[in-house]
Amino acid sequence: PFICKLDSEDQVTESENWELANPMFHQPLSEYAESLLETIFEEYEDLEDDPSNREEFMTKRMNLPVTDLERSVASYEEIMDTNRPLPNLEGRQAIGCLDFASLRDFAACGLLFKDKDDYVFKTHSFVRKQFADIYYGYSRKASEQTKERFAPIKEWENRGLLSVVDGATIEPQTVVDWFVEQRYKYGITKIVADNFRMDVLRPLLIAAGFEVVVIKNPRAVDSLLAPRIETAFANRHIIFGENPLMRWYTNNVLVKTNNDGNKTYLKKEEVRRKTDGFKAFVCGMYLADELTDYNFEDAFDILEELDF
């Protein structure tokens, strides 16, 4: 497909070049083009005071994705390269993981597998309908959508990547039920999560027969796992499959490095740019060394063939 964009990042400093990414800026300008150009000028000037929005500006306004690797988990290309077909995972050992920091917006569940040198992540999210309506225009009709880019919650729902929950909160039992359902297909050995909401979730998971591991110091784990995660992205050893929601989560992560070089995974924007799926992935990576490239169903088939 033909994409109008800047040829290089440094072209953004000359507003005359913006026409490359926005053909409507070719003279004479329409009334709408004049209004949009003024808006983009204001956004560009704001970058002087707050450069943290530069990645979003370059992607949204100049159609040129750029990545500040001092602030992001991986480059745009590395994140996009997670879009590879999932191998056959049925019967394989998996680490269950979840992020359930808030009952009122998002929750993410996941299963981490090892396939040779690759980390394969299968995930599902739950989103509260009222939150999706307010911040992403979930219930709007297509004719009512504004030009501002929202996360396409309804599209992701239709693709089975998430479920929208119409209630006052996301019920903890909903999360537990997802893992119970997955247990029929995969060998879930443990479920790991940080300590947020685990006072509620842990008894429910244990009652369902799962072994639960709680990460009590998530920031220390971020720092511990950052080199492994960054290396896995760089070497294309992470597979999310056809899952734009998971890539959205990952792209929303802000990497904060302290004076000692320790890294913490935060959000680039607190409200709309969610990271729940990525945080669940980090929890899974905490126990990744326990994973084996092993198929339980194959082992059971061999046992059935033995004559005792």
What residue ranges belong to the model's regions?
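Flexible loop/turn segments at secondary-structure boundaries
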Residues: 9-13, 68-71, 102-107, 117-119, ...
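Acidic, low-complexity intrinsically disordered tails
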Residues: 297-308
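Mg2+-dependent endonuclease catalytic cores in nucleic-acid-processing enzymes, primarily RNase H-like
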Residues: 129-260
